[in-house]
């Protein structure tokens, strides 16, 4: 027997759309464009809505009779509606028991429908407050997370400072400092390695070549005609100066 196939509770992904949005199609610009935004009207749950409609439309605009006044307490009205729904449901049960075919059954169903519509309308009027409260809670959570992150960074910084101070305190007091002469030689060597960009006189060039020949004694010099002529010229210039 084969292994039992796992069945997902979710519907399968829409393969007709997944095949269109591959990485290659997106890279080549062949992926379908998103649909244009709706600007006039649209259908939702079988009802037509306008884009400029209010988020929560008044009951009168939907052709529904208002049972509560314009100025009211939401909490109190919701409790009244809940109690009215319970009473009308019990009346409907009594009608179904005594006279199921009576016209009062349809009237009671319409009353229950109207009560439920009003209850949902009052609940929907709380949606903006719920959205603001959700946003406030989300921002508080983000603020608390950022403060905790900053506190952890501060603790790590203090630990690093303590480690550096411990390393400094563990160093011996008689630690030899770098010699100034060696530092000077290193500086002169670094300076000599740089190229001079300003123009030089002929005497400076000749003197520099003579100094190089005199100081670089360890460097082997080729005994060819060119090097001998340079040495002779340097000696003549030295005697003239």
From Swiss-Prot:
GO terms for cellular component: mediator complex. Transmembrane segments: none annotated. Keywords: Activator, Nucleus, Transcription, Transcription regulation. It comes from Danio rerio (Zebrafish). Residues 175-197 are annotated as: Disordered. This is Mediator of RNA polymerase II transcription subunit 7. GO terms for molecular function: transcription coregulator activity. GO terms for biological process: regulation of transcription by RNA polymerase II. Gene3D superfamilies: 6.10.140.200.
